[in-house]
């Protein structure tokens, strides 16, 4: 799922982006309202996580303009304002859900999953590769019908590779998706996650392209 995050608090924004990427989502992060509007014009997103108090253009203005144009992109509003009138204003402007700061990252992740299911009217499609199944809605992974326990970043890496089956993703792309701009990433972190996935799912699933990165081949028809 592709998510646009519009949040000007750098510490909070980095944490949200990292948390959503652990869910296997692709996140584009902007820090002001004008950049958010430009991103919405030039690209398509499955969800907008929108802070109300953005510089240059407020989140409510962006939301009203979005709905005025007839765009139905689901919107989760973030705000430090906790008065009922503020929540009503956000929802009346077209928001699908509302989260007041400070909040727990687990709650944000759960609201994003629920909002996506609710607005699409169906569960998120499962990712299937032979006997391997990954359910984005429940985070369950099964192999030949048996549940497989994965660590959060193992799950995020597997989902990313399955969503891009047939492609080769570089180590830098994978690090950016899983860790963002965090500076404390071990140089062999991706290799370690791949090793663990191969141990749990078999050596043939993830292909190494030396000097480039990793990929999962498209399943045979």
From Swiss-Prot:
Keywords: Cytoplasm, DNA-binding, Phosphoprotein, Transcription, Transcription regulation, Two-component regulatory system. Induction: By cationic antimicrobial peptides and by Mg(2+)-limiting conditions. Disulfide bonds: none annotated. The modification 4-aspartylphosphate is found at residue 51. One of its GO terms (molecular function) is phosphorelay response regulator activity. GO terms for cellular component: cytosol; protein-DNA complex. SUPFAM superfamilies: C-terminal effector domain of the bipartite response regulators, CheY-like. The keyword Transcription applies. Residues 124-218 bind DNA. Residues 2-116 form the Response regulatory domain. CDD domains: REC_OmpR_PmrA-like, trans_reg_C. It is found in: Cytoplasm. Member of the two-component regulatory system PmrA/PmrB that plays a role in the regulation of resistance towards polymyxin B and cationic antimicrobial peptides in response to limiting concentrations of Mg(2+). Functions as a transcriptional activator by direct binding to a cis-acting sequence upstream of the target gene promoters including lipase lipA and pmrH promoters. Also autoregulates its own pmrAB operon under Mg(2+)-limiting conditions. This is Response regulator protein PmrA. It comes from Pseudomonas aeruginosa (strain ATCC 15692 / DSM 22644 / CIP 104116 / JCM 14847 / LMG 12228 / 1C / PRS 101 / PAO1). The gene is pmrA.
């Amino acid at each position: 799922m592709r998510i646009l995050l519009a949040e000007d608090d750098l510490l909070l924004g980095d944490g949200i982006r990292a948390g959503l990427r652990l869910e296997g989502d692709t996140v584009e992060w902007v820090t002001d309202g004008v950049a958010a509007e430009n991103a919405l014009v030039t690209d398509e997103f499955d969800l907008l996580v929108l802070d109300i108090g953005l510089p240059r253009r407020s989140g409510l203005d962006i939301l009203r303009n979005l709905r005025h144009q007839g765009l139905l992109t689901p919107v989760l509003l973030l705000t430090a304002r906790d008065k009922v009138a503020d929540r009503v204003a956000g929802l009346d402007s077209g928001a699908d859900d509302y989260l007041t700061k400070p909040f727990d990252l687990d709650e944000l992740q759960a609201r994003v999953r629920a909002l996506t299911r609710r607005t699409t009217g169906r569960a998120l499609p499962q990712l299937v590769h032979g006997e391997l199944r990954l359910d984005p809605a429940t985070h369950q992974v099964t192999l030949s019908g048996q549940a497989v326990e994965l660590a959060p970043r193992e799950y995020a890496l597997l989902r990313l590779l399955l969503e891009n089956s047939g492609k080769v993703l570089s180590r830098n792309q994978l690090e950016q998706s899983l860790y963002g701009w965090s500076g404390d990433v071990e140089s062999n972190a991706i290799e370690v996650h791949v090793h663990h996935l191969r141990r749990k799912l078999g050596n043939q699933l993830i292909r190494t392209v030396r000097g480039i990165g990793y990929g999962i081949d498209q399943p045979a028809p």
